[in-house]
């Protein structure tokens, strides 16, 4: 039953996250606009994630936090983004948003069994799985210029896609110290398309350049959290009431593979059906 819930969750999230979600010209560069990996509860604390843990909320930034879970937790999040873009001659306001993440975490040692058995182990274990966007590409920009001897030149720039992270978290805690590891797979495809139209020239010229970049690879990071207990409950010294948490995370070099496809089409002559007669077509692919 738990496997079915996880599978349904990830399948639904993959379709939702993959939908168009933003219009940011800056996402043209690199692999796109980076996406914060912390969830809503951490966002309410200003993105503080290294030392954050909670019995009911998830934190994939520091996997050690999963050992502090005391129940099964299912989290999904939405995001909204407002952009105000300004050029020398115009301004543009844009709202965008989508499903931000879907995650499931659970403890591997039931607190109910501890109550029934009247025993409390110093060991705790937690596990979780999450699907999150890692970077986003999305823009649609058009410029219109009038040049001497060429007339009106229209340049269109469009981009879509992004990269995503499927993450598996595991953690163990002994007394007040927890360690954890994230094992993840990053994948995704981004498309960048530039179109130039010389609409006043005869015959009309139309240049189109499309780049497809696919990225995939294994990533990982580790985390440690330790609670410095300041005060415990009077009737149970194992229950902390006040504490300070120190958390650290680290990661090594990630080996990501990319496939770069490029297509260039130059067309001339506007046909009666509104399409162009292809003049040249060039295609190339690069794997790195």
Please tell me what each predicted stretch does.
Residues 1-23:
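Bacterial Sec-dependent N-terminal signal peptides
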Residues 19-288:
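Subset of outer-membrane beta-barrel
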């Amino acid at each position: 039953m738990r496997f079915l819930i996880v599978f349904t969750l990830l399948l639904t999230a993959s379709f939702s996250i993959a939908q168009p979600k933003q219009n940011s010209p800056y996402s043209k560069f690199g692999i796109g606009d980076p996406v914060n990996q912390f969830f809503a509860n951490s966002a309410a604390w200003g993105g503080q994630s290294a030392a954050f843990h909670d019995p009911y909320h998830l934190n994939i930034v520091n996997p050690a936090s999963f050992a502090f879970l005391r129940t099964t937790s299912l989290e999904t999040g939405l995001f909204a983004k407002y952009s105000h873009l300004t050029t020398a001659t115009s301004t543009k306001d844009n709202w965008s948003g989508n499903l931000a993440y879907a995650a499931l975490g659970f403890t591997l040692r039931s607190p109910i069994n501890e109550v029934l058995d009247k025993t409390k182990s110093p060991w705790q274990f937690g596990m979780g799985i999450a699907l999150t966007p890692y970077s986003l590409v999305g823009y649609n920009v058009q410029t219109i210029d009038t040049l001497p001897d060429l007339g009106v030149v229209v340049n269109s720039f469009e981009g879509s896609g992004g990269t995503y992270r499927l993450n598996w978290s595991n953690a163990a805690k002994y007394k007040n110290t927890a360690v954890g590891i994230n094992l993840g797979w990053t994948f995704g495809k981004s498309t960048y398309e530039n179109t130039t139209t010389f609409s006043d020239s005869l015959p009309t010229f139309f240049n189109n350049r499309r780049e497809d970049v696919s990225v995939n690879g294994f990533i990982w990071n580790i985390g440690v959290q330790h609670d410095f207990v300041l005060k415990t409950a009077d009737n149970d010294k194992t229950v902390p009431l006040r504490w300070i948490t120190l958390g650290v995370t680290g990661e090594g070099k990630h080996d990501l593979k990319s496939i770069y496809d490029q297509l260039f089409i130059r067309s001339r002559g506007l046909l009666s059906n509104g399409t162009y007669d292809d003049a040249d077509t060039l295609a190339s692919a690069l794997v790195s």
